[in-house]
Amino acid sequence: MSPKALNVRVTTMDAELEFAIQSTTTGKQLFDQVVKTIGLREVWFFGLQYTDSKGDSTWIKLYKKVMNQDVKKENPLQFRFRAKFYPEDVAEELIQDITLRLFYLQVKNAILTDEIYCPPETSVLLASYAVQARHGDHNKTTHTAGFLANDRLLPQRVIDQHKMSKDEWEQSIMTWWQEHRSMLREDAMMEYLKIAQDLEMYGVNYFEIRNKKGTDLWLGVDALGLNIYEQDDRLTPKIGFPWSEIRNISFSEKKFIIKPIDKKAPDFMFFAPRVRINKRILALCMGNHELYMRRRKPDTIDVQQMKAQAREEKNAKQQEREKLQLALAARERAEKKQQEYEDRLKQMQEDMERSQRDLLEAQDMIRRLEEQLKQLQAAKDELELRQKELQAMLQRLEEAKNMEAVEKLKLEEEIMAKQMEVQRIQDEVNAKDEETKRLQDEVEDARRKQVIAAEAAAALLAASTTPQHHHVAEDENENEEELTNGDAGGDVSRDLDTDEHIKDPIEDRRTLAERNERLHDQLKALKQDLAQSRDETKETANDKIHRENVRQGRDKYKTLREIRKGNTKRRVDQFENM
């Protein structure tokens, strides 16, 4: 390695990259190396951020050597690759999946750390999209209780404000997660951002400033323009200036001057605590204004090609998605059919077992009947024998008319005894005959049942041999554009591209919840659910401000429309009097 080579570590939202650069390497050369490595083409949104020697976060200057910038001396040198500028509408502007992912991760982190205020009900809904983006479709078999225990999904503020256990939070998020079934991970990220961009603090860079009266205020710089906030409320801007009203920005030391297009309006002037703050404000104003104007012009060839490629990729992905959905539907049908077969097979087995039991009972009954018939036949044989013996005795009696009286009496007694024995045997035969008839009836009934059971078993057996087919499919899933960087010292002035015919985009802008009835109902239901466990003693200042804004029917865009009313002069005067 050359002795002049320097080690550099660049942290993106989901990776760490390490490079060796030369002492002559510029910010742009390092930036280009990063975007080439991660495959990013929408470079205009991003920048390299570092911590300077004073501990402040600063954006690297592209056309200045890295070593000549006030980077904190470490080995390796530390940089963060972050979104510097935000789109007006994520759904319209973000082209590449990598761009979408980086924005999603950065915005999600800002919400979880409370850098962007997000009300509790919106936090839970966003968490459900975050789970879909990370884990895909909910699966009740693998995604059991405790599955989300290690995922960071909600701002700590929201958790602290509600008397809910971890399991209850998880169940709430999983309930909404199941609503997103079949949604691609990229689509879940996009839905997350579409909701997040309606949050008041989304995409705003805040700077501490003072007006001429010395009142401490906040300046907010974002994709739509400049806004002024009171010191204790960064949710609700009080005065707004769209980019289309501004023709020049400049600063002299700590004083920052904004010249409106309206020549009759006075300059808009404020004071920053340090000159370096004014440099950052100037750079952000220039970059946001440039992108604001660029959106209102035809796309460059590069962007057209990028969008065409993205459309092709999305169409291909859509086709794959449709194939996947068809495969999933086929799998569900096959699984349902298989379950039906298994249920029928189980029923058949139960019926066959029952038939087997009935058959065994019938066979046992037949054995008993056969035994009974044998006994009956033996009794009949014995009866016949005794009747013959009796007949012989009677014949002897008839022949022995001349017998002695004693012998005759003895013979008569023997005949009477034999008659009684014959009667007894006759009674037994009659009883056994009745029992035999009853058993014959039972056997006949058992045989009928056996025939019915055999027919049913045969039918079930025939059904179980129907061919089964299971089709299971699985599926998952440079041109450089210059970023404007303020490299200013002393008095700096920049004229901005203007067009008096540009319509303020805020005029027709509505929040997604206002435009989407389903989302509106989801948030309303979540708010009602969370209200039952809310601990009002844990409310923050932002919670109270948000609640009051909702009570008065305000949202991000309604507020912006309200504070941009009237001519520029009136708003400048209003600022001076704050």
Curated annotation (Swiss-Prot):
PROSITE patterns membership: FERM_1, FERM_2, FERM_3
Compositional bias of kind Acidic residues: 475-484
GO molecular function, one term: actin binding
Location, primary (coarse class): other
Compartments where located: Cell junction, Adherens junction; Cell projection, Microvillus; Cell projection, Rhabdomere; Cell membrane
Domain FERM: from-to ranges: 1-296
Cellular component GO terms held in the UniProt record: adherens junction; apical part of cell; apical plasma membrane; cell cortex; cleavage furrow; cytoplasm; cytoplasmic side of apical plasma membrane; cytosol
Region (Disordered): 463-555
InterPro entries noted in UniProt: Band_41_domain, ERM, ERM_C_dom, ERM_FERM_C, ERM_helical, Ez/rad/moesin-like, FERM/acyl-CoA-bd_prot_sf, FERM_2
Compositional bias of kind Basic and acidic residues: 492-555
Positions of modified residues (Phosphothreonine): 559
Domain of life: Eukaryota
SUPFAM superfamilies from the UniProt entry: Moesin tail domain, PH domain-like, Second domain of FERM, Ubiquitin-like
Processing after translation: Phosphorylated on Thr-559. In the oocyte this phosphorylation is induced by phosphatidylinositol 4,5-bisphosphate (PtdIns[4,5]P(2)) generated by sktl.
UniProt subunit comment: Interacts with wgn. Interacts with Mer and arm at the adherens junction. Interacts with cytoskeletal actin at apical buds of microvilli in the precellularised embryo. Interacts with PCID2 (possibly via FERM domain).
Record-given protein name: Moesin/ezrin/radixin homolog 1
Gene name, Swiss-Prot/TrEMBL: Moe
